[in-house]
C-alpha cells in the first residue's frame, strides 16, 4: 500500500507518495511514477521470458536482460533497462532460418507451434499447460479456436554444436485470411505444410501450397494428428504424393499433441530450408545499404506504431535515421524517422540494439498512423540510394458492408479505433458514408463474411465499441450507353463503366447493363456427398467447370458461382450437408452479365436507405417476403397503421401491415343515441389518418442488427 502526504514546500504542483512497505522509505515523485508505471507495465508484460531463453542459449548473467517483474524506482534505472539489450551480431545469415507454418484450418498449426516453442525452451511446459495455442493472442482467436493474425516468434536452438536463430511465423488457415499467409511468406525462405491424417489434402491446403510455390519456398510436408483414432496415414500419404507431388520419404508423420516424431522437424528445418540471401544489387544502389520490409504492424498505446520487419539487406540500429519508400514517393516533404526501439519477438518483445541481415524483429520509429506504416513498404537509411523491395499484392475486398456505431455519438471513437485496427489488418478498405436511418459510418470492404464478423468482434472486444453492420453486398459493374458526353479529347465515348458496392448507388436507368462478380470455387469432398453438393451449387446458379476423383473416396469439384450467392450461408450449408467433411476455396473470376435488381424497403411509402438489397430477379420475391415478415416482428406497434413494403422499381412485390394501437373511445358512452358513438369513431378515424400522414416510423437501432442476421426473430416488445 502507498500512503500519501501532501508536501508543503515551494513546489505547489508536486505531490509525493511515501511507500511504507519499502525498507529504504523511498520517495516517489508522482509525475515520474505515473510515467514509469505506464512504461514498465508494458515492459513487464512483454519481457517476462527474457531471462529464461537467455539462460537456455548460453548467455552469461551479465549478458542477460534483467527481469522486468522487479520494477525500477526512478527514471535513471529505466534508462539502464533500455541499455541492457540482446546482442544478435553472432547470428549471421548462415545460422538463420525463416519459415512459416501453412495448412488448412484446424489441421494442427497452432498445436505444432506450441511444441516448437517448448522444444526450443522459448516457453516452459508449465506455462504451456495453461496457455495452449500460445501464439493465438487475440480473444476472438481463443473463443473461435482459429488463427486470425499471423504471429512471429524467434527461437534459439543448438544443433550439431552450433546455435541457430529460427524465426517462426504461424499463419491462419481460413480462406478469408489468405492475405495474412501471403504477407508472411514474404519474410520466409521455407514452409512447413501440414496435412491432417484424418482429413487429407483440403481446398486451402492446395491454395497455400501454390502460394508457397509462387514464393519459391522450400516446402517440408508434415502429416499431423497420427495419434487419433480417425487417422488414415496410408490414404493421406497417397493424397499427398498424388496431389502435392511430394515423395513418401519426405513426409514427416507426427503428433504435436503427444510429441511423437516431432523431434525430426527442427533438424529438417535447419538442413532443408536455405539461409536468407540478400536481394540482387541494382545499378546505382548503395552497396550493403539497409533494405527492410514491413510485413505487419500494430498500434501501441505508448509507443505508437510498432512495425514487424524483415531485414533483407544491411542492418539497422537504435538511433539510425530512416526513410519510408512509400512516404518519399508520395510526399513532397518526406518524413525522416529515428529508430527508438528494436527487438525480436520471443515470443514477446525482447529489446536489442541492432538487427542484421536475414533477421526478423520489431521496429519503433515514431510512426503514428496507418498512412505512415504501409504493409509491403521498404525502410532504408536516409542518405542511401536503394531500389525498393517487391512488396505485396494489395488484397482485393470481396464483400462490402456499412459499419455504424450503435450509439451515434460515438462516431469519432469508431473512426479512431478503426484507424488503429487497420494497422493490424490492411486488407480492410474503408470509406465514409452517411445513412438517413443509421447516421454517419463507414463503407468497409472485407475478404469474406468470417473476416467481416471477426472485424466486428475485435471492435467490441479490443476497443469496447458496439456497432451495426448492414447487409453485406459485393461489387457490381454498371455499363450505360453514353448520350453524348465528351471526353478531354473531344470525342464521345460509346459507354460509361462504373463500379458500385452500395445498393443505394444502384442505377434507376432500366437500360443500364449490370454485371455481377463471379467466383471460381474448388470444393474437396468425400464421394458420398457429391450429389447434394451438385444440387446446392445449381440452386446458387453455379456452373460446373471440372470434376476430378483423386482417389476412390476423394473428389475435387470446381464450379463458377456468383459471388453474391456465396456471401450469406453457402459455406454453412456446405458444411452441414457434408457433416463438416467438405472444404471450400475460391478466387475471383471476373464479371458476367446478370439480371439483378434493387430491392427497396419502404415504411409508409418512405424508403429506408439502410435496408436496400441487390438480388437476382428470380429470387427478388422470396427475399422481399422474408424481409417484410421479419420487419413486422421487429417494429413496435404505433398509434397509427404501418405499411411495410418491398419494391423493385415502382412495383410493390411484398407487403405487410402492422396494426395500430386502438383506444376504445366509446367506453364512456352508456346507451343513448348511436350517432354519438359513430361521431367519436369517425373523429378517431380522421385523427389516425392525419397521424399516419404526419408521423414517422422509427426502426430501433438494435433491430437492424437482428434483421441482418439469418436466425429466427421473436415478436417485438409491444409494451413500448
Curated annotation (Swiss-Prot):
One of its GO terms (cellular component) is mitochondrial inner membrane. It is found in: Mitochondrion inner membrane. It is a peripheral membrane protein. Its main location: mitochondrion. Gene3D superfamilies: 3.30.70.240, Elongation factor 4, C-terminal domain, Elongation Factor G (Translational Gtpase), domain 3, P-loop containing nucleotide triphosphate hydrolases, Translation factors. One of its GO terms (biological process) is positive regulation of translation. Its EC number is 3.6.5.-. It is an enzyme of class 3 (hydrolase). Residues 94-277 form the tr-type G domain. Keywords: GTP-binding, Hydrolase, Membrane, Mitochondrion, Mitochondrion inner membrane, Nucleotide-binding, Protein biosynthesis. InterPro entries: EF-4, EFG_III/V, EFG_V-like, EFTu-like_2, G_TR_CS, LepA_C_sf, LepA_CTD, LepA_IV. It catalyses: GTP + H2O = GDP + phosphate + H(+). GO terms for molecular function: GTP binding; GTPase activity; mitochondrial ribosome binding. SMART domains: EFG_C. GTP binds at residues 103-110, 170-174, 224-227. Belongs to the TRAFAC class translation factor GTPase superfamily. Classic translation factor GTPase family. LepA subfamily. Promotes mitochondrial protein synthesis. May act as a fidelity factor of the translation reaction, by catalyzing a one-codon backward translocation of tRNAs on improperly translocated ribosomes. Binds to mitochondrial ribosomes in a GTP-dependent manner. PANTHER family: TRANSLATION FACTOR GUF1, MITOCHONDRIAL (PTHR43512:SF7), TRANSLATION FACTOR GUF1-RELATED (PTHR43512). This protein may be expected to contain an N-terminal transit peptide but none has been predicted. This is Translation factor GUF1 homolog, mitochondrial. It comes from Naegleria gruberi (Amoeba).
Amino acid at each position: 500500500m502507498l500512503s500519501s502526504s501532501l508536501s508543503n514546500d515551494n513546489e505547489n504542483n508536486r505531490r509525493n507518495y511515501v511507500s511504507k512497505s519499502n525498507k529504504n522509505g523511498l520517495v516517489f515523485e508522482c509525475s515520474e511514477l505515473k510515467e514509469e508505471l505506464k512504461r514498465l507495465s508494458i515492459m513487464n508484460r512483454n519481457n517476462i521470458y527474457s531471462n529464461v531463453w537467455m539462460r537456455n542459449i548460453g548467455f552469461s548473467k551479465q549478458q542477460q536482460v534483467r527481469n522486468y517483474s522487479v520494477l525500477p524506482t526512478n527514471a535513471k534505472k529505466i534508462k539502464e533497462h533500455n541499455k541492457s539489450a540482446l546482442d544478435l551480431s553472432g547470428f549471421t545469415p548462415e545460422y538463420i532460418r525463416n519459415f512459416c507454418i501453412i495448412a488448412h484450418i484446424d489441421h494442427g498449426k497452432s498445436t505444432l507451434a506450441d511444441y516448437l516453442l517448448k522444444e526450443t525452451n522459448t516457453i516452459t511446459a508449465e506455462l504451456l499447460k495453461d496457455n495452449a495455442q500460445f501464439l493465438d493472442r487475440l480473444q476472438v482467436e481463443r473463443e473461435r479456436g482459429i488463427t486470425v493474425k499471423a504471429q512471429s516468434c524467434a527461437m534459439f536452438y543448438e544443433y550439431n554444436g552450433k546455435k541457430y536463430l529460427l524465426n517462426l511465423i504461424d499463419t491462419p488457415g481460413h480462406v478469408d485470411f489468405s492475405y495474412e499467409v501471403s504477407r508472411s511468406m514474404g519474410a520466409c525462405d521455407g514452409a512447413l505444410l501440414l496435412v491432417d491424417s484424418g482429413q487429407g489434402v483440403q481446398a486451402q491446403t492446395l491454395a497455400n501450397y501454390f502460394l508457397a510455390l509462387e514464393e519459391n519456398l522450400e516446402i517440408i510436408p508434415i502429416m499431423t494428428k497420427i495419434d487419433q483414432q480417425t487417422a488414415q496415414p496410408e490414404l493421406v500419404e497417397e493424397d499427398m504424393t498424388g496431389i502435392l507431388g511430394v515423395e513418401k520419404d519426405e513426409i514427416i508423420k507426427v503428433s504435436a499433441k503427444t510429441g511423437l516424431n516431432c523431434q525430426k522437424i527442427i533438424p529438417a528445418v535447419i538442413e532443408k530450408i536455405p539461409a536468407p540471401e540478400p536481394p540482387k544489387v541494382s545499378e546505382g544502389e548503395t552497396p550493403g545499404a539497409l533494405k527492410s520490409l514491413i510485413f505487419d504492424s500494430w498500434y501501441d498505446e505508448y509507443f505508437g506504431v510498432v512495425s514487424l520487419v524483415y531485414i533483407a539487406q544491411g542492418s539497422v540500429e537504435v538511433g539510425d535515421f530512416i526513410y519510408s519508400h512509400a512516404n518519399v514517393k508520395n510526399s513532397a516533404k518526406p518524413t525522416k524517422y529515428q529508430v527508438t526501439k528494436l527487438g525480436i519477438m520471443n515470443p514477446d518483445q525482447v529489446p536489442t540494439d541492432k538487427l542484421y541481415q536475414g533477421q526478423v524483429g520489431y521496429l519503433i520509429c515514431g510512426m503514428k498512423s496507418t498512412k505512415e506504416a504501409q504493409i509491403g513498404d521498404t525502410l532504408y537509411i536516409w542518405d542511401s540510394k536503394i531500389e525498393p523491395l517487391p512488396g505485396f499484392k494489395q488484397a482485393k475486398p470481396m464483400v462490402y458492408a456499412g459499419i455504424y456505431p450503435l450509439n451515434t455519438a460515438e462516431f469519432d471513437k469508431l473512426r479512431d479505433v478503426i484507424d488503429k485496427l487497420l494497422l493490424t489488418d490492411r486488407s480492410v478498405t474503408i470509406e465514409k458514408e452517411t445513412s438517413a436511418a443509421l447516421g454517419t459510418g463507414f463503407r468497409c470492404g472485407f475478404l469474406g463474411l468470417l473476416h467481416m464478423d471477426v472485424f466486428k468482434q475485435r471492435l467490441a472486444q479490443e476497443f469496447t465499441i458496439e456497432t451495426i453492420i448492414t447487409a453485406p453486398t459485393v461489387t457490381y459493374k454498371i455499363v450505360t450507353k453514353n448520350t453524348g458526353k465528351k471526353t478531354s479529347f473531344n470525342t464521345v465515348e460509346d459507354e460509361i463503366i462504373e463500379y458500385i458496392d452500395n445498393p443505394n448507388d444502384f442505377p434507376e436507368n432500366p437500360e443500364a447493363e449490370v454485371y455481377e462478380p463471379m467466383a471460381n470455387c474448388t470444393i474437396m469432398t468425400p464421394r458420398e456427398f457429391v450429389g447434394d453438393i451438385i444440387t446446392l451449387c445449381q440452386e446458387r446458379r453455379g456452373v460446373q467447370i471440372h470434376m476430378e476423383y483423386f482417389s476412390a473416396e476423394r473428389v475435387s469439384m470446381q464450379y463458377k458461382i456468383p459471388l453474391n450467392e456465396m456471401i450469406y450461408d453457402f459455406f454453412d450449408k456446405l458444411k452441414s450437408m457434408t457433416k463438416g467433411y467438405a472444404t471450400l476455396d475460391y478466387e475471383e473470376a471476373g464479371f458476367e452479365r446478370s439480371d439483378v435488381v434493387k430491392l427497396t424497403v419502404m415504411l409508409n411509402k418512405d424508403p429506408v436507405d439502410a435496408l436496400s438489397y441487390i438480388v437476382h430477379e428470380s429470387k427478388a420475391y422470396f427475399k422481399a417476403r422474408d424481409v417484410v415478415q421479419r420487419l413486422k416482428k421487429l417494429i413496435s406497434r404505433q398509434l397509427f397503421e404501418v405499411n411495410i413494403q418491398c419494391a423493385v422499381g415502382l412495383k410493390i412485390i411484398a407487403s405487410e401491415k402492422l396494426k395500430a394501437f386502438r383506444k376504445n373511445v366509446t367506453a364512456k358512452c352508456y346507451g343513448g343515441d348511436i350517432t354519438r358513438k359513430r361521431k367519436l369513431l369517425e373523429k378517431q378515424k380522421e385523427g389516425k389518418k392525419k397521424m399516419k400522414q404526419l408521423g414517422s416510423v422509427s426502426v430501433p437501432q438494435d433491430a437492424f442488427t437482428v434483421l441482418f442476421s439469418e436466425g429466427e426473430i421473436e415478436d417485438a416488445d409491444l409494451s413500448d
